[in-house]
């Protein structure tokens, strides 16, 4: 375990003892929950992060885009369930606060990931599904905000529909039937689904 919080003692584990999974970076699945453990949940080779910077124009999603750019340069990914960092949760962080316009940059980040993998159709398909899911989640989180409904809702709705079929295919492939049904409902009965979410 590494605790890198300022002023803390650093404790090292001599080796990782749990099972690890080695993945081909050219088959990375952006739709799995593990794909979203993003920048703070990864250890990188120097060769993968060289010349990559966090995007200044993104308030949310900059870490996901950073991870995508690193994976694009990698050949393999090793996934471990070991907790190697203490994660400090800041209740005032930008990701946990109420809606503001900067939250929409998460869609921009996912659009860039889809473009980044334009020449890798398998990976791009999962990125499209991830993008559609992010759009749907924005409506779930901020659908009660009048400001979101004015500023972000049209783009979130269009983004969801643009690649919702890829998302539903991924859900079926992964046997996530409950989520597939929820997505189908929102796909075919969007307006009723939004009103339901606003009433919750």
Q: How should these model regions be labeled?
A:
Residues 144-200:
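Membrane-interface aromatic/basic loop that binds lipid-linked glycans or pyrophosphate carriers
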Residues 67, 106, 110, 128-131:
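Short runs of predominantly hydrophobic/aromatic residues within well-ordered alpha helices
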Residues 124-132, 154:
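Short, charged, amphipathic alpha-helical segments
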């Amino acid at each position: 375990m590494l605790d890198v919080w300022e002023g803390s003692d650093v404790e090292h584990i001599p080796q990782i003892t749990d099972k690890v999974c080695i993945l081909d970076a050219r088959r990375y699945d952006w739709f799995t929950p593990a794909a979203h453990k993003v920048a703070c949940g990864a250890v990188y080779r120097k060769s993968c992060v060289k010349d990559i910077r966090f995007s200044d124009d993104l308030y949310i999603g900059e870490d996901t885009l950073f991870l995508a750019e690193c994976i694009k340069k990698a050949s393999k990914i090793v996934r471990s369930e070991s907790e190697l960092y203490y994660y400090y949760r800041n209740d005032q962080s930008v990701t946990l606060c109420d809606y503001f316009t900067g939250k929409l940059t998460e869609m921009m980040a996912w659009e860039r990931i889809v473009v980044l993998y334009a020449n890798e159709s398998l990976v791009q398909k999962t990125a499209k599904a991830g993008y559609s899911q992010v759009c749907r989640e924005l409506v779930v989180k901020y659908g009660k905000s009048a400001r979101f409904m004015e500023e972000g809702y049209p783009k979130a709705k269009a983004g969801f529909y643009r690649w919702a079929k890829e998302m539903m295919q991924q859900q079926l492939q992964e046997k996530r039937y409950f989520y597939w049904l929820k997505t189908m409902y929102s796909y075919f009965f969007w307006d009723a689904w939004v009103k339901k979410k606003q009433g919750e």
